[in-house]
């Protein structure tokens, strides 16, 4: 670009890239002598200023789009100058928010890194008078990195500037200026510059820097990280502006149930406390990083959900049961956070032995047989109050490498008394967790307690693998996407768990969890007007409607001798 305000194709550097961007470091920046040109689109873009500004407004609020090192941004100050003509820009003091983050570190071994986070003053930026740019929207945002024990939290001014020149009505400039005093303060997740400018001018998109005075030579080398970052910034601005123009809508909407900021803060604290121990001592054959960080995220979500449902003192008001607890990592985290509860699984896992004794004692090797399969129907119970079981018998075939195949017959009375069986008759203050709990997934909404279930594999009430069809199509249906060929299978399972929940009276909420898994839909039931009367007739009807539960006990008892599955 040239200083007279027209789009300019560099004569000094004709480097072409796969995105048809040009490296223009040898060209004078149109923004002024203090600015350095880096990249521009080779030719005119097809999107308008309105598309560009809408896209960049989203990037300002969601800086993790540009860097995976960034967790989020908290908007501390926002001033919109684009008010009615003649009116003064208004700043609502209530918009000013200070988000404090608990170190979560009792030992004082490490502190959260922060730089100038008290500085909330908007930083202005000089630009060429030829463009007649002035701010229309000003922000101060606080950038929170994923690991704020390693990378510093900073504040940053974000400006959207438009031209007052009638010839440049489609000109728009986005400027990022970190609130730091020198290059050495610059955190890893932003380019080492005083300011970054992303300019749309005469339908050409370009990126410019104001370098620190002591460092200008590195910008001529495209292999330098700070230069590569400029390229990526242009990529993002170009891609997202095109997306707005084409009417792109987000496929998944997160944070529908639990506040995003609270969840992320809790996640970071839990990650700091527990990830190192769990990864280093992992005893399973599965990938520790995937499972550890997934369980930490689920624990963070549950804690924030419980605070929302029961209040800050939730620990004194509830306890959990993790059905199908697997490796026990989720239970370990929750129990270590002084939350009462038990984990139950059909098979003890190797990882259980790495936990402290008080955690190990809360992990139970039992199979789940819902009491509804063993107890008399409530109507019969009212007529015969002393009746404790339904008098049924259940033949189970067993095989052994030494003796011939045989059949063991269990009575409902035997199973109710067996220490190997858990009938899911929990205290009234219990909250049930079903984290990829397979055969138990569809059962959990029927057990008469608030719950969160994260479906994984489809099984019916008999424990058999089945495929459920999606009952309805809604705008949310596209949220349930698996990246393998079983998209419709998973969609059907999630939809069916929602249906079961509604069928028996639950007010259903759904959250797409921020976990490293394609099977990340959480179905949550907290409110149910009929809860005191469970199991209701609707529960029996739901089991009957789905084909009954014949075979559940036989299939469940056979789990006692089967190797555990991994997910």
From Swiss-Prot:
Keyword Nucleotide-binding attributed: no
Disruption phenotype: Increases cellular ROS (reactive oxygen species) levels. Increases RNA level of TRM3, TRM7, and TRM13. Sensitive to oxidate stress induced by rotenone. Mildly slows cell population growth.
Keywords for this protein: Cytoplasm, Methyltransferase, Phosphoprotein, S-adenosyl-L-methionine, Transferase, tRNA processing
Subcellular location: Cytoplasm
Catalysed transformations (reactions): uridine(44) in tRNA(Ser) + S-adenosyl-L-methionine = 2'-O-methyluridine(44) in tRNA(Ser) + S-adenosyl-L-homocysteine + H(+)
Phosphoserine, modified sites: 107
Disulfide-bond pairs as recorded: none
Listed EC numbers: 2.1.1.211
GO biological process: one example: tRNA nucleoside ribose methylation
Major enzyme class: transferase
Keyword Ribonucleoprotein: no
One Gene Ontology cellular component: cytoplasm
One Pfam family per UniProt: AdoMet_MTase
Signal sequence extent: none
InterPro entries per UniProt: tRNA_uracil_MeTrfase
Any one GO molecular-function label of the UniProt entry: tRNA (uridine) methyltransferase activity
UniProt-listed PANTHER family: TRNA (URACIL-O(2)-)-METHYLTRANSFERASE-RELATED
Family: Belongs to the TRM44 family.
Note: Present with 7720 molecules/cell in log phase SD medium.
Function: tRNA (uracil-O(2)-)-methyltransferase, which catalyzes the formation of O(2)-methyluracil at position 44 (Um44) in tRNA(Ser).
Name this polypeptide is given: tRNA (uracil-O(2)-)-methyltransferase
Organism: Saccharomyces cerevisiae (strain ATCC 204508 / S288c) (Baker's yeast)
